[in-house]
C-alpha cells in the first residue's frame, strides 16, 4: 500500500494546487501565530473551498483557544484537526472532528504509552523534540525510537526531505509522511520541483 503524503505549511492557493497536482493526499494549514507559516482562518477556508475532491485539509493548532478552533472548522466540513500542543484527549475529541495528535519524540519516552493516551485519534504524528518549539523544527529524530506495533496509524514528520523520505518509509513503514520545510524555497513558500520529488519518492518508496 502506498504511503500517504501530507504537505504542511500551506499559505497560498498556488502551493495548494501544486501539491494536489503531484498527488498529495492532505494539506496542512498552520493556525499558530508564532509560526512563519501561519495562515489566517479566512484565507485557509478560501483555499479549502477550491481544493479537489478527496484531498484532506488539516488544521494545525498549538494549545489554541476554543474560539479559534471553532472559527476555522466552522468554515468547512472537510477539516481534520491536528493538535500539536499539550491537549488532552478530552480536549481533542470535544470538537467532534477527526483528529491527529502530534507527539514530539525524545529518548526515554514510552512512545506506546503516549500513543495509547489518545484512543480516539485517527492517527498519531511523530515529530522531533526541540525544547520550546512545538513543531516544524526541520530536524530528524532517531527513528529507532518508534516501536513496532503501535495501536494507531503513524504519520512520520521531522526533517523529511526528498533525499531521505524513501529511507524513512523503508525503515519506519508509516501510514503517512508529513513535510513542510523540506520542500520550501523559503518559510511558507513551496518549491514545485521539491514537492514533486518528495511525493514521487514517497509514493514509490
Swiss-Prot record:
Keywords: Amino-acid biosynthesis, Aromatic amino acid biosynthesis, Isomerase, Tryptophan biosynthesis
Superkingdom in the source lineage: Bacteria
Pathway: Amino-acid biosynthesis; L-tryptophan biosynthesis; L-tryptophan from chorismate: step 3/5
One GO MF term: phosphoribosylanthranilate isomerase activity
Catalytic activity: N-(5-phospho-beta-D-ribosyl)anthranilate = 1-(2-carboxyphenylamino)-1-deoxy-D-ribulose 5-phosphate
Gene3D superfamilies from the UniProt entry: Aldolase class I (3.20.20.70)
Enzyme Commission number(s) from the entry: 5.3.1.24
Keyword Amino-acid biosynthesis found: yes
Keyword DNA repair belongs to the record: no
SUPFAM superfamilies per the UniProt record, alphabetical: Ribulose-phoshate binding barrel (SSF51366)
InterPro entries documented for this protein: Aldolase_TIM, PRAI_dom, RibuloseP-bd_barrel, TrpF_fam
GO biological process, alphabetically ordered: L-tryptophan biosynthetic process
Family: Belongs to the TrpF family.
Entries under HAMAP family matching the protein: PRAI
NCBIfam families xrefs: PRK01222.1-4 (NF002298)
PANTHER family (UniProt xref): N-(5'-PHOSPHORIBOSYL)ANTHRANILATE ISOMERASE (PTHR42894:SF1)
Protein name: N-(5'-phosphoribosyl)anthranilate isomerase
Gene expressing this chain: trpF
Amino acid at each position: 500500500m502506498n504511503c500517504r503524503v501530507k504537505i504542511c505549511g500551506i499559505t497560498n492557493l498556488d502551493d495548494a494546487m501544486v501539491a494536489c497536482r503531484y498527488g498529495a493526499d492532505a494539506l496542512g494549514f498552520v493556525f499558530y501565530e508564532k509560526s512563519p507559516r501561519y495562515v489566517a482562518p479566512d484565507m485557509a477556508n478560501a483555499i479549502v473551498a477550491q481544493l479537489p475532491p478527496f484531498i484532506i485539509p488539516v488544521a494545525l493548532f498549538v494549545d489554541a483557544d476554543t474560539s479559534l478552533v471553532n472559527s476555522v472548522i466552522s468554515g468547512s466540513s472537510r477539516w481534520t484537526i491536528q493538535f500539536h500542543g499539550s491537549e488532552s484527549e478530552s480536549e481533542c475529541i470535544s470538537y467532534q472532528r477527526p483528529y491527529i495528535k502530534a507527539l514530539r519524540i525524545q529518548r526515554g519516552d514510552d512512545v506506546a504509552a503516549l500513543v495509547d493516551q489518545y484512543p480516539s485519534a485517527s492517527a498519531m504524528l511523530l515529530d522531533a523534540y526541540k525544547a520550546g518549539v512545538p513543531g516544524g523544527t526541520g530536524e530528524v529524530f532517531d527513528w529507532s525510537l518508534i516501536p513496532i506495533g503501535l495501536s494507531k496509524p503513524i504519520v512520520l514528520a521531522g526533517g523529511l526531505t526528498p533525499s531521505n523520505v524513501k529511507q524513512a518509509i523503508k525503515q519506519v513503514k508509516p501510514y503517512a509522511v508529513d513535510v513542510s520545510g523540506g520542500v520550501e524555497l523559503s518559510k511558507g513558500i513551496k518549491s514545485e520541483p521539491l514537492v514533486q520529488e518528495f511525493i514521487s519518492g514517497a509514493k514509490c518508496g
